[in-house]
């Protein structure tokens, strides 16, 4: 399996619950390295641009409102099969359908406030990482 990078966002609901460290620990215990990270308060423009592919969906306005309701932690994770591994750790989008022990099963309350975001493909990972980080902000982890 190839070493990949993926974007992960700890959403406002999880930040407010003060579980950032617990979520990051799960990534690291699963063999993923954090190679870039920052806490940001997204503007409506930034959140809308990030989720532009959903612009015509009925939930778009609520999604943007939620993502701007408090700070988020945005990070780049790196590791073998990072995209699939991160999605497995997150669990199903709807926390009621998420496997026990996944991030969403443990920390999310609804399909709307579901604790985390993760890239779903190599193409989306590349696009999403570039949306939040300059190449110089992503640090190779060689030790």
Swiss-Prot record:
Superkingdom classification of source: Bacteria
Keyword GTP-binding: no
UniProt keyword terms in alphabetical order: ATP-binding, Cytoplasm, Kinase, Magnesium, Metal-binding, Nucleotide metabolism, Nucleotide-binding, Phosphoprotein, Transferase
GO biological process, one term: CTP biosynthetic process
Residue positions binding ATP: 11, 59, 87, 93, 104, 114
Cofactor: Mg(2+)
Enzyme class: transferase
Gene3D superfamilies in alphabetical order: Nucleoside diphosphate kinase-like domain (3.30.70.141)
Catalytic residues in the record: 117
Compartments (UniProt record): Cytoplasm
Molecular function terms, GO-annotated: ATP binding; metal ion binding; nucleoside diphosphate kinase activity
EC number annotated for this UniProt entry: 2.7.4.6
A GO term from the CC aspect: cytoplasm
Catalytic activity: a 2'-deoxyribonucleoside 5'-diphosphate + ATP = a 2'-deoxyribonucleoside 5'-triphosphate + ADP; a ribonucleoside 5'-diphosphate + ATP = a ribonucleoside 5'-triphosphate + ADP
Subunit details: Homotetramer.
Function: Major role in the synthesis of nucleoside triphosphates other than ATP. The ATP gamma phosphate is transferred to the NDP beta phosphate via a ping-pong mechanism, using a phosphorylated active-site intermediate.
Family membership: Belongs to the NDK family.
Protein name, as recorded: Nucleoside diphosphate kinase
Protein source organism: Azotobacter vinelandii (strain DJ / ATCC BAA-1303)
Designated gene of the protein: ndk
